[in-house]
Amino acid sequence: MPEAEILFSETSHYLKAEDVTQLKNAYLFGQGAHSGQFRKSGEPYISHPLAVAGILSKLHLDVPTLTAALLHDVVEDTDISKAEISERFGESVAELVDGVSKLTKIE
């Protein structure tokens, strides 16, 4: 079973169906935003945000946190803006994504 399907299956045990749908939408959005980007290992870039979301799902974290995990590099590494994340997934998700992006700039 592909990693994304595992995430959706695992989260369906503790999230509502509409929340799992949001995760699927975030995954597809992130996959599209990172299209053509690859990790140093050669894997598609989306594999990293998906792995982060998978780890957080084992802690049974909420849907905004998991959504932000799937999107955490989108603003930093693509042309997608925080405003677009907010429009599509809500202000709380956009703030989480923005906060993670700012962590990389702390010295």
Regions inferred by a protein language model and the residue ranges of each:
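Active-site helical microenvironments for divalent-metal-assisted chemistry
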Residues: 1-107
